[in-house]
């Protein structure tokens, strides 16, 4: 049995010779807070190698293996590492009260000349390194270490034995980041030093270590050898919260292991709700790409590929990945992953947006409508009232889909003789609407309309009245929605006066509404239904 000497219960201390970024201090590597530990260590963006990270142990240790994860920068940044050890023990005993009061940022680090180079590695595309001691032998009461199979994604490097004290009597371990790629940031995501107390440690220190180990690890975890590449992923640490629900954490870990790697964002390691294909061939989530673009914008740089740094051009843009999105959705339907709700779709925007909230009278109408069938739509009014899409814009996705389907005009009101409108027809209708709304208030324009044309407009306005939740144009109407009283056409170009909607769905302009309010009781001109003044809503195009 070997122990992870970087766990906080063994009170290691750590120090870096360079400035760290906010929230990514070097103390995160040995922190008791699991959130801080997951952030890892990262220097400021202007720091260049070499960067020295020194870990000081409160007792001399014999190193078995050193695991280093270098993915804290979101990509492959670090390409060169060197390992140094020192046997100088300028510190107090581990189990003394004085050592218990020292903080993690107060290590007594020896001079540079006291360190011995024991390992070196150059990385190409890997981000995890394992330095192992071939001559390590476990001693009682520490059991024999089981053999572990190396992972192909991890670089395995042997430590060099530079003397009797270089690996078996270590007081300080120094990690030197020697090279980074391009403008990369020196970083360490995770650090683990596995070993056992040195032969020179007293029996009292060994007993204390065994006691701490047995108190902070479950029985089944304490008796098994760690697995590559990062053994502390399943260590519950010394927090009681993690000991209370080990089964849920283990279940979540098993589920995450079953997720295909292509479904995970390579930067955040989370399932991608909206995968985007980058010009470099990499696939990341849309939210991750937006965060990268915002980060670039803070430094005055244009949006670029996070992996290559090449700026986007009109001919080289990130594109959605629909086939991968379909596979991710299918996978989530087959597997239940906590916290993943990625199959929803955005609610479609309505053509009309109310400027008021639900009024008490409307709420009473909705409750009363539960027992009255709707003859126009052929469904129960208990599902949705005619004004429900306007007064409930923040309903759920399922409700919004039902409202959209319910408020569609029935087949008896639709002209099925014509096919879908072409672009030229839509453009022509848009020009007619703009022209009619502009000239509608001019007497010289309205005087040219004959009595038959006015009667036709009035009949069309009463038969094909504009309903909320539908588009700005009905199949039988060319000019669009209009005032039920004066027949003035409303459109996005109509900016002179506000528009109001009655509970029956018909629209009124401001002057006509004022006339209706002066003559009580107020009724709709088109359908002759009574209208309460508090039920009138102002709508916007």
From Swiss-Prot:
Enzyme Commission number(s): 2.3.2.27
GO biological process: protein polyubiquitination
Zinc finger (RING-type): 483-528
Listed GO CC annotations: focal adhesion; nuclear body; nucleoplasm; nucleus
Pathway(s): Protein modification; protein ubiquitination
Record-annotated U-box domain positions: 258-338
Intracellular or extracellular location(s): Nucleus
InterPro entries assigned: RNF37_RING-Ubox, Ubox5, Ubox5_N, Ubox_domain, Znf_RING, Znf_RING/FYVE/PHD, Znf_RING_CS
Tissue: Expressed in liver, heart, brain, kidney and testis.
Disulfide bonds: none
Entries under SMART domains matching the protein: Ubox (SM00504)
GO MF terms held by the record: ubiquitin protein ligase binding; ubiquitin-ubiquitin ligase activity; zinc ion binding
Cited SUPFAM superfamilies: RING/U-box
PROSITE patterns in the cross-refs: U_BOX, ZF_RING_1, ZF_RING_2
Reaction(s) catalysed by this chain's protein: S-ubiquitinyl-[E2 ubiquitin-conjugating enzyme]-L-cysteine + [acceptor protein]-L-lysine = [E2 ubiquitin-conjugating enzyme]-L-cysteine + N(6)-ubiquitinyl-[acceptor protein]-L-lysine
Key words of the record: Metal-binding, Methylation, Nucleus, Transferase, Ubl conjugation pathway, Zinc, Zinc-finger
First-tier enzyme category under EC: transferase
Residues with Asymmetric dimethylarginine modification: 451
UniProt free text on domains: The U-box domain mediates interaction with E2 ubiquitin ligases and is required for the ubiquitin-protein ligase activity.
Subunit structure: Interacts with UBE2L3. Interacts with VCP.
Free-text function comment from the UniProt entry: May have a ubiquitin-protein ligase activity acting as an E3 ubiquitin-protein ligase or as a ubiquitin-ubiquitin ligase promoting elongation of ubiquitin chains on substrates.
Protein known as: RING finger protein 37
